[in-house]
Amino acid sequence: MKDAGEVNLLLQLSQLEKQLLNSATERSADFVTSLLSPDFQEFGTSGLVYVRADIVDALADEPATTTSAEDLDLRVISSDAALLTYKSTKAVGGAASVRALRSSLSVRRDGEWRMLFHQGTRIA
């Protein structure tokens, strides 16, 4: 059972994650830059590796999407590190949905939570 601090952190990090998944928010370079750590790295569902600049640069070319997140779970690693895991379903236009298992490692720096690492693994 999670204590009140863990529940609040789960809500905070889940909200940020869901905002990042929202295609309208994704296109806000300022928001993404503020959420991702300068040394951010992602292993995408495509198998490609991205850094923060790649994510910000790709925003303008990203098609409109609808992505849902479910089964969110938080593991507190330390007072300044937490791992959020969940399942996502992404629909692009009328195309088939892409489902993935996702993990986001966030760290607290200067009192603010920033995503340091993210991995998406396609669900077959």
Predicted regions and their residues:
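A beta-strand edge to alpha-helix "cap/lid" segment located at domain peripheries
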Residues: K2-S34, D39-A124
